């Protein structure tokens, strides 16, 4: 069981939460990025550098993640592919993607892409708030408790 992070777009405050969680849970944490990352020394934390390019990091996460893993990403298509493989997916704002919600999120993403392509300014997400950080930490903990329960 591994926690995979789409690290190029993951906020540093979320990475810090994940570093502490990896130590506490004693789970491998792999940060996948197309640039060098500085991470704390730990036998549980490692980086995986991939070539620069569109979806290269996403494709590597999909290739390596397995059922039971957790993928941290705000990228809806990556989350959908991880869920198809049996992994859990969580965004940095603490929203867990599920098979029931991912289709709706993909549809909304495609709709927003269409609006942007037609020249309509849609704006980006708000900056990460303290509430978002707390929601992320709480959902990560909830996932971990579910994992422990399923192990019996």
From Swiss-Prot:
Cross-referenced Pfam families: DUF188 (PF02639)
UniProt xrefs under InterPro entries: UPF0178
Organism's domain of life? Bacteria
HAMAP family this protein is in?
Answer: UPF0178
The similarity comment for this entry is: Belongs to the UPF0178 family.
The protein, known as: UPF0178 protein YaiI
The species this protein was found in:
Escherichia coli O17:K52:H18 (strain UMN026 / ExPEC)
């Amino acid at each position: 069981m591994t926690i995979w992070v789409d690290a190029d777009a993951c906020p540093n405050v979320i990475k810090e939460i994940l570093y502490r969680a990896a130590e506490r849970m004693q789970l491998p944490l792999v940060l996948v990025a197309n640039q060098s990352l500085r991470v704390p020394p730990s036998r549980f934390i490692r980086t995986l550098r991939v070539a620069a390019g569109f979806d290269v990091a996403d494709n590597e996460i999909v290739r390596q993640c397995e059922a039971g893993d957790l993928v941290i990403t705000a990228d809806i298509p990556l989350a959908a592919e991880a869920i198809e493989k049996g992994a859990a997916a969580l965004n940095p704002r603490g929203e867990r993607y599920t098979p029931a919600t991912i289709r709706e999120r993909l549809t909304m993403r495609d709709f927003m892409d269409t609006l942007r392509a037609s020249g309509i300014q849609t704006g980006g997400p708000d900056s990460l708030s303290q509430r978002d950080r707390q929601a992320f930490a709480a959902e990560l903990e909830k996932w971990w408790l579910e994992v422990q329960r399923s192990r019996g």
